[in-house]
Amino acid sequence: LVDTGLLVALHAADYPYHALARHWLARHDGALHTVGSVLAETAWQLPARERARVADFVRRGAVRAHAPDLPGYARMAELLVKYADLDPDWADIELVWLAETSGIRRIATLDRADFGVYRLHGRQRFDIVWPR
């Protein structure tokens, strides 16, 4: 799974983690998965001229974008209530939903504080694989 920080780092050469993100991606051998809200956050953080690159990244199949169905939104509502004290953002909760649905626990995120707390199905920890 990929969170906003990795995608911004890949698309913004002046971002502090740019070289680290490109190096990680060159060595990564699995599919990348994310959610629409992460793509929206990524585009919002890039200059207007660079935003189309995010859509092209998905179009080329470099990352697969997933969207919740109605039961997925119900699960997200449960998670938003459960983690309300952390004030989670929508993208985080959507990624937790995707992890639970897909069984993928590995995540590339700069948000170690929150993803260190979130649990899949209330039990399993995320495996934060980037940055290391």
Across the structure, where does each feature detected by a protein language model lie?
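A short glycine/serine-rich beta->alpha loop
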Residues: 29-30, 80-86
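Short, well-structured N-terminal submotif of metal-dependent ribonuclease cores
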Residues: 1-34, 45-56, 121
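Short active-site oxyanion
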Residues: 28-32, 62-64, 101-106
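Conserved glycosyltransferase catalytic-site signature
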Residues: 4, 36, 89-93
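Alpha-helix/helix-capping structural signal
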Residues: 5-6, 37, 71, 113
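Acidic, PIN/NYN-like endoribonuclease modules and their adjacent C-terminal/linker elements
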Residues: 96, 100-132
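Acidic catalytic patch
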Residues: 13, 62-83
